[in-house]
Curated annotation (Swiss-Prot):
PANTHER family: ATP-SENSITIVE INWARD RECTIFIER POTASSIUM CHANNEL 11 (PTHR11767:SF44), INWARD RECTIFIER POTASSIUM CHANNEL (PTHR11767). Residues 90-120, 132-142 are extracellular. Belongs to the inward rectifier-type potassium channel (TC 1.A.2.1) family. KCNJ11 subfamily. A 1,2-diacyl-sn-glycero-3-phospho-(1D-myo-inositol-4,5-bisphosphate) binds at residue 176. It is found in: Membrane. One of its GO terms (biological process) is positive regulation of protein localization to plasma membrane. Residues 1-66, 168-390 are cytoplasmic. This is ATP-sensitive inward rectifier potassium channel 11. It is a multi-pass membrane protein. Disulfide bonds join 110-142.
Length: 390
């Protein structure tokens, strides 16, 4: 149970997670295609790749990038092909030496107990997997057989090393750690220190920390140059703030990351009406750091489209002090509350600061103050008489 420091009146908290109840839940218009999905996957399809042989120049990375069924199928076929190949070699050695001839031979065979291709295949498996049943063995009669034995052992060790390394890299990939790095479903634009700010919340569900965590943000939109060139995915970096300055964050508890919308911001001319009609705006957020337990660099990504940005709302507090420690209520991670915010662009607010003064005056006379006065004048429903205490 959280302390009273984290309690907010229920009528000022949205019942649906970071969603405007005045807007329809389902939109009929077509949404803009995402460049980065909410889970961090890049929505890009590569087509007509001519030089596909470049993928074979880095076989290990190609195997790691493949899906599990494809990777397991490749290693299974590698073992089967190597066993069959060396089984054919052992059968040819026995055939050339005359070990497959019927009857009792007086000559010492190259490999004992090989009488057919099946026995040669079993011997190939015993050599490469080092089972060592003992029924078949290489003799000193054929130096070529000794050389093939050495080569097959080396090939088997190489396949095992590549398979174990690939499986380890696939199970310890950085995106596994990113599954517990969460972002708020919606972003908000509201006032902070008299300036319009773009805000989002980020948190880490694990107790193991992300070392040297940094956060970056980019605005992706369709633009046209003065020469008439259309750039469908024009990326612009914008600075983020976390309360202490810089992009580095100490992610021991959920943080609200914000960007001050100033004259250098690509959101300087963004108005509330653009959030419902602006189809070419996408804000990508990238959180990167080193996993404390494994030392592997991980990266978590998400994006916000125009209709996923809430104007005039603020994230509710979720960190409260309780019993000498801080507790985090993740059930309110994406909850927002409406706050007075000017319905104009940041440029208009900078040019006319009287809009902010009028907003401050209107908020001081708002229903929130009247409600607090009414609550203060309300009489308690229960009273304790002095006689009951004696």
């Amino acid at each position: 149970m959280l302390s009273r420091k984290g309690i907010i009146p229920e009528e000022y908290v949205l019942t649906r997670l970071a969603e405007d109840p005045t807007e329809p839940r389902y939109r009929t218009r077509e949404r803009r295609a995402r460049f980065v999905s909410k889970k961090g996957n890049c929505n890009v399809a590569h087509k007509n790749i001519r030089e596909q042989g470049r993928f074979l120049q880095d076989v290990f990375t190609t195997l790691v990038d493949l899906k599990w069924p494809h990777t397991l199928l490749i290693f299974t076929m590698s073992f089967l092909c190597s066993w069959l190949l060396f089984a054919m070699v052992w059968w040819l050695i026995a055939f050339a030496h005359g070990d497959l001839a019927p009857g009792e031979g007086t000559n010492v065979p190259c490999v004992t107990s090989i009488h057919s291709f099946s026995s040669a295949f079993l011997f190939s498996i015993e050599v490469q997997v080092t089972i060592g049943f003992g029924g078949r063995m290489v003799t000193e009669e054929c130096p070529l057989a000794i050389l093939i034995l050495i080569v097959q052992n080396i090939v088997g060790l190489m396949i095992n090393a590549i398979m174990l390394g690939c499986i380890f890299m696939k199970t310890a990939q950085a995106h596994r750690r990113a599954e517990t790095l969460i972002f708020s479903k919606h972003a908000v634009i509201t006032l902070r220190h008299g300036r319009l700010c773009f805000m989002l919340r980020v948190g880490d569900l694990r107790k193991s920390m992300i070392i040297s965590a940094t956060i970056h943000m980019q605005v992706v939109r369709k633009t046209t140059s003065p020469e008439g060139e259309v750039v469908p995915l024009h990326q612009v970096d914008i600075p983020m703030e976390n309360g202490v300055g810089g992009n580095s964050i100490f992610l021991v508890a959920p943080l609200i990351i914000y960007h001050v919308i100033d004259s250098n911001s690509p959101l300087y001319d963004l108005a509330p009406s653009d959030l419902h009609h602006h189809q070419d705006l996408e804000i990508i957020v990238i959180l990167e750091g080193v996993v404390e337990t494994t030392g592997i660099t991980t990266q978590a990504r998400t994006s916000y489209l125009a209709d996923e940005i809430l104007w005039g709302q603020r994230f509710v507090p979720i960190v409260a002090e309780e019993d000498g420690r801080y507790s985090v209520d993740y059930s309110k991670f994406g909850n927002t509350v409406k706050v007075p915010t000017p319905l104009c662009t940041a440029r208009q607010l900078d040019e006319d600061r009287s809009l902010l003064d009028a907003l401050t005056l209107a908020s001081s006379r708002g229903p929130l103050r009247k409600r607090s006065v009414a609550v203060a004048k309300a009489k308690p429903k229960f009273s304790i008489s002095p006689d009951s205490l004696s």
